[in-house]
UniProtKB/Swiss-Prot annotation:
This is Serine/threonine-protein kinase TBK1. It is found in: Cytoplasm. The keyword DNA-binding does not apply. Belongs to the protein kinase superfamily. Ser/Thr protein kinase family. I-kappa-B kinase subfamily. Keywords: ATP-binding, Coiled coil, Cytoplasm, Immunity, Innate immunity, Kinase, Nucleotide-binding, Serine/threonine-protein kinase, Transferase. It comes from Xenopus laevis (African clawed frog). GO terms for molecular function: ATP binding; protein serine kinase activity; protein serine/threonine kinase activity. Transmembrane segments: none annotated. Residues 635-709 form a coiled coil. CDD domains: STKc_TBK1 (cd13988), TBK1_C (cd21954), Ubl_TBK1 (cd17127). It comes from the Eukaryota.
């Protein structure tokens, strides 16, 4: 045990080891509270005195929630060496988090955002105080749990830190080689002399590597044998990285470098966040310091990302979930643009559904006032046009094959890899289940939407039919009355209008048969019935995710034992036999997990996807058919209105002739009516006209009554209204 005036610690209770110091878990002598005590070793005292004091001076200047706090600088009682008493973070470092098999393929999106936000905030505080860190890596980012249960990450280990303004440079070498800027790597690792100086932006390179590591679970630049086994190739990769690339991997010995400007498919981050973060990585992982972003631009872009809100969207026809990162002040057109960038569905073609209803967003509505969405309750987007069924983006990773011979180190590493893949299977299986649950929900809603569209068409078609019938009867009666009363032929235009009305009626009758065809597809037994969604694909009742989790727990248990075996370095005969039996069990559990994932989860998902493609084709055809009927119905109604308008004008034109002054009437009537009963015949004709007009009024009233009753009718007796938000 060692101690200072106010703190004590056990030498066996070590938290971390570095080149110049060890960190122990210590306690305050009076309160018993836990602290991290940094004790410097003999190598530390070989440094110049000003360098030794630099860490103390830097920590004294800093005070931020995302930087490990310095509480005291005291002397160890026996050696009188300085020790730092700092804030204790009980959840270890980001490196420890990334070493967990659960995070083998990167942190969950929510945790990645916390890491990146906290690191950016901590770095911003450093730059405000004119300090560079020079050794940023996951091992120097500590984690604790905040009062709200969320992680809080803090920068630590300022042994390499120094004061340096943005326009200043330095030549001394610090850092961890996997995270070093290429210029520093060349001199510090390869020991090649050059005259280059370094600026504060070298921290940005280290941040880029750290963020990539956090997002994917792997380092971005990897020689075949590993970064520390082939340093020449490592330098070749980082120094020769093309602009825009964010990773370079050598897959085989002496093989080519595979460059990529995207994060891998195994990454946990949504495409929405990847689209925003990938340019950040590309511009800070830039070997040319002239091309690399400065801190000001880095802080501006990252804070813009952190200040956005997420709108969860599900593209029904593409079977793809999306997260739309949007500014709170952005409006509906901006939202449609962002949806287009991820789905390639043009804004004018996007139809939105939310909680089973049409979602109509006014153009001026701010994003902060959109409906609250989640992964399980997103806004559904669809279109009347045919789009490809894409599905969830993932890789079918194969379980690593174990080696046959006995090797504790290799077995522990293999068990860790198997555990990581099993965790990945669990995550993807849960995602596939969620996608299919959303598909089932969306297809039911879409079926209801098509029924609504059908009912609207039937309603409109009935209105048009009644209007045409009325126009036809009115025209026929007018023709008959005018010919009887006026005893002369009617203008040819009236006959043409009558013929046009008859033709429109014939076309409208054709629409009825088209509607009946659509109805047959939508009703039970039709080709667009959605009953198949209840039988195909993965279901929660299958409990595949739970089965995978059981296998994962068995695999994890063996992995933990293998870690202990590795730490022992040598096992007794009985322990060795148990180890071999566990290895066999590990292979058996892994094979079961792979079979369950591939056959039950991915296999059934693919069947559902192919069925979806077939159903969507039929759905698009029916919706286009309904749209065509609606368009034709509108055209017929428009033409009927023109005919009705002409008839009304003709009636107004003929009325003065029918009811002209007696003198005028005589001249018109005398040649026609030679009978002495002319006046009686005219009176009877006028009465007949009055009766016909009263009949027309009565028919109009009856038609209106029919329309009012029809307004409540649908296929299933439930007419749903548009939901306008």
């Amino acid at each position: 045990m060692q101690s200072t005036a106010n703190y004590l610690w056990m030498l066996s209770d070590i938290l971390g080891q570095g080149a110049t110091a060890n960190v122990y878990r210590g306690r305050n002598k009076k309160t018993g509270d836990l602290y991290a005590v940094k004790v410097f070793n003999s190598l530390s005292f070989q440094r110049p005195a000003d360098v030794q004091m630099r860490e103390f001076e830097v920590l004294k200047k800093l005070n931020h929630k995302n930087i490990v706090k310095l509480f005291a600088i005291e002397e160890e009682m026996s050696s009188r060496h300085k020790v730092l008493v700092m804030e204790f973070c009980p959840c270890a470092s980001l490196y420890s988090v990334l070493e967990e098999p659960t995070n083998s393929y990167g942190l969950p999106e929510s945790e990645f955002l916390i890491v990146s936000r906290d690191v950016v905030a901590g770095m911003n505080h450093l730059r405000e105080n004119g300090i560079i860190h020079r050794d940023i890596k996951p091992g120097n980012i500590m984690r604790e749990i905040g009062e709200d249960g969320k992680s809080v990450y803090k920068l630590t280990d300022f042994g390499a830190a120094r004061e340096l303004e943005d326009d200043e440079q330095f030549v001394s070498l610090y850092g961890t080689e996997e995270y070093l800027h290429p210029d520093m790597y060349e001199r510090a690792v390869l020991r090649k002399e050059h005259q280059k100086k370094y600026s504060a932006t070298v921290d940005l390179w280290s941040i880029g590597v750290t963020f990539y590591h956090a997002a994917t679970g792997s380092l971005p630049f990897r020689p075949f044998e590993g970064p520390r086994r082939n340093k020449e190739v490592m330098y070749k990769i980082i120094a020769g990285k093309p602009s825009g690339a964010i990773s370079g991997v050598q897959r085989a010995e002496n093989g080519p470098i595979e460059w990529s400007g995207e994060l891998p498919a195994t990454c946990n981050l949504s495409m929405g966040l990847q689209t925003l973060f990938t340019p950040v990585l590309a511009n800070i992982l830039e070997a040319d310091q002239e091309k690399c972003w400065g801190f000001e631009q880095f802080f501006a872009v990252t804070n813009d990302i952190f200040n956005r809100i997420v709108v969860h969207v599900f593209s029904l026809q593409q079977m793809t979930p999306h997260k739309i990162y949007i500014n709170t002040y952005d409006k509906v057109p901006d939202f449609h643009d962002l949806v287009y960038k991820q789905t390639k569905i043009p804004g004018q073609n996007q139809e939105l559904l939310f909680e089973g209803r049409r979602l109509v967003l006014e153009q001026g509505r701010l994003a902060q006032h959109f409906p609250i969405t989640t992964d399980e309750n997103p806004i559904f987007v669809l279109t009347r046009e045919m789009v490809s069924v894409i599905g969830l983006r993932f890789d079918e990773i194969v379980i690593p094959k174990p080696i046959s011979h006995y090797d504790l180190d290799v077995d522990a590493n293999m068990a860790k890899a198997v555990t990581g893949v099993a965790c990945y299977y669990c995550r993807i299986a849960a995602s596939l289940l969620l996608v299919l649950d959303l598909m089932r929900k969306g297809i039911r809603w879409l079926s209801e939407l098509m029924k609504e569209e059908y009912n609207e068409n039937v309603h409109r078609n009935t209105e048009v039919s009644l209007k045409l019938n009325f126009c036809n009867r009115t025209t026929e009666k007018d023709l008959k009355i005018y010919e009887q009363l006026m005893q002369t032929s009617v203008e040819s235009e009236v006959y043409a209008i009558h013929a046009k009305l008859l033709n429109l009626s014939s076309t409208q009758e054709g629409l009825k048969s088209s509607l009946q065809e659509v109805k047959n597809k939508l009703t039970p037994g039709g080709t667009l019935m959605d009953s198949w969604i209840n039988t195909e694909g993965i279901h929660a009742a299958d409990r595949n995710v739970e089965k995978l989790q059981v296998l994962l727990s068995l695999i994890t248990e063996i992995y933990c034992q293998f870690k202990k075996d590795k730490a022992q370095r040598r096992l007794s005969y009985n322990e060795e036999q148990i180890h071999k039996f566990d290895k066999q069990k590990l292979c058996l559990h892994a094979a079961k997990a792979y079979s369950l994932f591939k056959d039950e989860c991915v296999g059934k998902y693919e069947v559902f996807r192919s069925k979806t493609l077939e159903w969507m084709r039929k759905m698009i055809h029916v919706r286009k058919q309904l749209f065509s009927i609606k368009s034709k119905c509108f055209d017929i109604e428009e033409e009927a209105s023109k005919c009705q308008h002409y008839i009304n004008q003709y009636q107004e034109k003929m009325s003065p002739k029918m009811f002209a002054a007696p003198s005028g009437m005589k001249s018109a009537v005398n040649p026609i009516y030679s009978s002495p009963n002319t006046l009686v015949e005219m009176t009877l004709g006028m009465r007949k006209l009055k009766e016909d007009m009263e009949g027309v009024v009565k028919e109009l009233e009856e038609n209106n009554h029919i329309l009012e009753r029809f307004g409540a009718l649908t296929i299933d007796g439930d007419f749903r209204n548009v939901d306008c938000i």
